Amino acid sequence: MEFDPTKINISSIDHVTILQYIDEPNDIRLTVCIIQNINNITYYINITKINPHLANQFRAWKKRIAGRDYMTNLSRDTGIQQSNLTETIRNCQKNRNIYGLYIHYNLVINVVIDWITDVIVQSILRGLVNWYIDNNTYTPNTPNNTTTISELDIIKILDKYEDVYKVSKEKECGICYEVVYSKRLENDRYFGLLDSCNHIFCITCINIWHRTRRETGASDNCPICRTRFRNITMSKFYKLVN
């Protein structure tokens, strides 16, 4: 059975292109999620969405000698660090259609595809990936002194901020014992981070504490652990996010 590009449906979510190959008469439905990394002009393919077992097989293969050698050589040939040959989008509500293990397309075409026992699916997957790459050639036009943020970078940044937000929204101020994000006034819904410890305070309470200590000639100590601090940083999150 030959690959037929007319059977492709294309959509996108959060910088991820979703290719759905639907061949109803032959009972074939294949979903391939692809991220194009414009920093190194390459593609990352979600093997979890192709078949969840492939991700487990890949992780096991990567630990073997053959897998380690292949990853080392691919990293050398592409100039991409081994840690950047794979990316993971975690499973959460907003990512339910695109989550999974994304790996460099070379690994899919030359390694993972051979683990698929259905030769028809093999053929269609190869055709689908090659068709997408052939029709989505991208050459960045950015000055040499400009840093380009890739789609992978954007997703990792969003995930990082979502994680810290989920923790922050439950945190209580160590002085007033109110949940910081639930404070009545919007300007109070910020954290005051001390440079000396990790205790949690809303910006209003810690500023009042700081001002009172200065007015009375007392030293600037954390209200909880009494460790001396020098600076208070206003932050929307309970900790600084780099």
From Swiss-Prot:
GO terms for molecular function: acid-amino acid ligase activity; ubiquitin protein ligase activity; zinc ion binding. GO terms for cellular component: host cell cytoplasm. The keyword Transferase applies. Residues 21-131 form the KilA-N domain. InterPro entries: E3_ubiquitin-prot_ligase_p28, KilA/APSES_HTH, KilA_N, MKRN-like, Znf_RING, Znf_RING/FYVE/PHD, Znf_RING_CS. It is found in: Host cytoplasm. It comes from the Viruses. Disulfide bonds: none annotated. Keywords: Host cytoplasm, Host-virus interaction, Metal-binding, Modulation of host cell apoptosis by virus, Modulation of host ubiquitin pathway by viral E3 ligase, Modulation of host ubiquitin pathway by virus, Transferase, Ubl conjugation pathway, Zinc, Zinc-finger. The keyword Zinc applies. Pfam families: KilA-N, zf-RING_2. A zinc finger (RING-type) spans 173-226. It catalyses: S-ubiquitinyl-[E2 ubiquitin-conjugating enzyme]-L-cysteine + [acceptor protein]-L-lysine = [E2 ubiquitin-conjugating enzyme]-L-cysteine + N(6)-ubiquitinyl-[acceptor protein]-L-lysine. Belongs to the orthopoxvirus OPG021 family. This is Host range factor p28. It comes from Variola virus (isolate Human/India/Ind3/1967) (VARV).
